[in-house]
């Protein structure tokens, strides 16, 4: 990100003229405003709020993705876009602060979304194991299945606790970046473990 090629030329009136193309812009097809990173005078990495109504702002071709289809993803093309000084986000040369903060919130949201996926997998496992019968009884009565579901419960609520703790840290503005990173990593690992466990409960029918 710090190697951004989009150029922002400072003007005498304090405004900036931006030229470049930004890839993979979330909601690029319909958003009214974008956060764009550019190098002022080719050197100082800075963040700007770009409004769709600015002359020279165009959206590129929609990306066709395997997942996250509810979000429009397009390039945003900037051709001699004049941006007023008030649309500078933070300070010139301090855009990395904005960029890394965005990543922290993204990691937190990843942890929260995996928590929902895990709860869904847990519910499906409990339902299926109660419905499927082998040897005259539900497979939920078998020790191996009980162990798997119990392990899923423990992991799921460990994720939930970490997500709520991270939310509290963000609300308190304590800047615990390491906790946010840890939440995303642990949640991703635990979700993988839980999704693997549901396969062991449901067998090939899950596929």
Descriptions of predicted regions:
Residues 58-160, 197:
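Glycine-rich beta->alpha junctions and the first turn(s) of the following alpha-helix
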Residues 1-2, 27-31, 69-71, 91:
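Short glycine/proline-enriched turns and hinge-like loops at secondary-structure junctions
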Residues 157-202:
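C-terminal helix-coil-helix/basic helical segment that borders enzyme active sites and/or dimer interfaces
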Residues 20, 125-129, 163-170:
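Extended amphipathic alpha-helical scaffold segments
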Residues 6-9:
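A structural signal for short hydrophobic beta-strand segments in well-ordered beta-sheet cores
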Residues 15, 19-59:
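A short core secondary-structure module
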Residues 18-20, 36, 48, 78, ...:
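Buried hydrophobic positions in well-ordered alpha/beta secondary-structure cores of metabolic enzymes
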């Amino acid at each position: 990100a710090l190697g951004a090629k989009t150029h922002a030329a400072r003007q005498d009136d304090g405004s900036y003229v931006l030229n470049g193309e930004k890839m993979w812009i979330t909601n690029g097809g319909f958003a009214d405003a974008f956060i764009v990173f550019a190098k002022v005078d080719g050197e100082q990495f800075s963040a700007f709020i770009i409004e769709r109504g600015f002359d020279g702002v165009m959206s590129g071709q929609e990306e066709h993705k395997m997942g996250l289809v509810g979000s429009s993803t397009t390039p945003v093309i900037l051709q001699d876009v004049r941006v007023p000084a008030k649309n500078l986000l933070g300070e010139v040369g301090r855009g990395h602060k904005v960029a890394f903060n965005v990543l922290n919130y993204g990691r937190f949201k990843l942890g929260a979304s995996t928590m929902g996926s895990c709860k869904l997998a847990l519910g499906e496992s409990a339902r299926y194991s109660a419905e499927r019968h082998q040897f005259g009884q539900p497979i939920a009565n078998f020790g191996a299945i009980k162990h798997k579901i119990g392990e899923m419960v423990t992991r799921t609520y460990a994720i939930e606790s970490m997500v709520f703790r991270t939310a509290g840290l963000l609300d308190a503005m304590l800047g615990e970046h390491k906790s946010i990173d840890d939440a995303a990593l642990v949640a991703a690992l635990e979700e993988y473990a839980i999704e693997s466990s549901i396969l062991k409960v449901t067998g090939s029918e899950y596929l």
